[in-house]
């Protein structure tokens, strides 16, 4: 949000410290390391959930179908290990969140599972937030998606292990 505000004529808002509170899940958290350390010792890192003082109602669509408007899939209990699927319910090729606030920009976030955590807080600054997971989306190229949906802001989110891979994430 700060980078968009500093480098463009588009102005985005994000809740200040008094308007957002983070809750820490007590569960063991694998996070983005899941694919590399499955079954190995957990560290002390904890998953955080953003709670906005003034929640914004929204509609959610996953892969073109209207979905339940949730941001977090709560774990069964405090001891079950949690990972990135807790954010946004996991990976979808395309998620669209509509807040119906025309004064805010339409934003496209593309990348891989790292987008899931960002989506849970980014939507509040958007009229529409589109998220494309390049590993699972194949309906059209990223360029065609941008031409069709005309977002005001486009943000790419990748981890260093995938950005130079010419398959999946790197092919776009």
Residues of each region from the PLM?
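Extracellular glycan-modifying ectodomains
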Residues: 1-172
């Amino acid at each position: 949000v700060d980078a968009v505000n500093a480098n463009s004529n588009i102005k985005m808002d994000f809740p200040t410290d008094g308007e957002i509170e983070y809750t820490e899940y007590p569960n063991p958290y694998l996070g983005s390391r899941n694919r590399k350390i499955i079954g190995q010792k957990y560290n002390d890192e904890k998953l955080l959930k953003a709670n906005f003082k003034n929640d914004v109602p929204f509609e959610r669509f996953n892969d073109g179908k209207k979905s339940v408007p949730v941001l977090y899939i709560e774990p069964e209990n405090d001891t079950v290990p949690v990972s990135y699927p807790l954010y946004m319910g996991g990976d979808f090729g395309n998620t669209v969140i509509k807040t119906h606030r025309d004064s805010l920009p339409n934003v496209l976030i593309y990348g891989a599972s790292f987008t899931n955590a960002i989506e849970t807080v980014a939507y509040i600054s958007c009229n529409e937030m589109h998220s494309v997971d390049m590993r699972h989306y194949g309906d059209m190229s990223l360029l065609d998606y941008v031409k069709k949906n005309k977002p005001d802001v486009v943000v790419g989110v990748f981890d260093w292990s995938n950005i130079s891979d010419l398959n999946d994430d790197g092919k776009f």
